[in-house]
């Protein structure tokens, strides 16, 4: 199982646009996801996941590798998650738990209610505004 703690950028709270949730290039994370053919430009696959209510969700796992094809990007992303995040009312600090289940993938959300505003990151310090 892997867990993604959502940032305000992941949830759209910053108002910015990003091309999906960044998946760090760590083997323990990448081994969880389907294998992609890195010899092709921007390989991707559709992942079908079931949530704790039995509802199916489709996300795209993409390796933006155009750096090796004349571009600038070299990163993995999980895209197509906006509807899931919004329908579950997820905010910065909440979690999405991903697990493998025969024959596919499962996910579940966990609301942490840690913040009334965006989590502010400054260097290695994290300031969290908690509810009293």
Pin down the residues of each PLM region.
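Acidic, low-complexity intrinsically disordered regions
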Residues: 1-132
């Amino acid at each position: 199982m892997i867990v993604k703690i959502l940032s305000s950028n992941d949830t759209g709270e910053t108002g910015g646009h990003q091309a999906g949730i960044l998946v760090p290039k760590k083997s323990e994370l990448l081994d969880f996801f389907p294998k992609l053919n890195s010899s092709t430009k921007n390989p991707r696959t559709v992942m079908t996941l079931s949530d704790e209510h039995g509802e199916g969700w489709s996300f795209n796992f993409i390796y933006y590798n155009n750096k090796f094809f004349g571009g600038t990007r070299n990163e993995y992303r999980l895209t197509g998650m906006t509807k899931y995040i919004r329908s579950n009312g997820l905010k910065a600090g909440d979690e999405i738990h991903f697990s493998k289940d025969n024959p596919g993938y499962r996910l579940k959300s966990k609301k942490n209610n840690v913040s009334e505003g965006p989590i502010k990151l400054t260097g290695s310090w994290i300031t969290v505004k908690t509810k009293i």
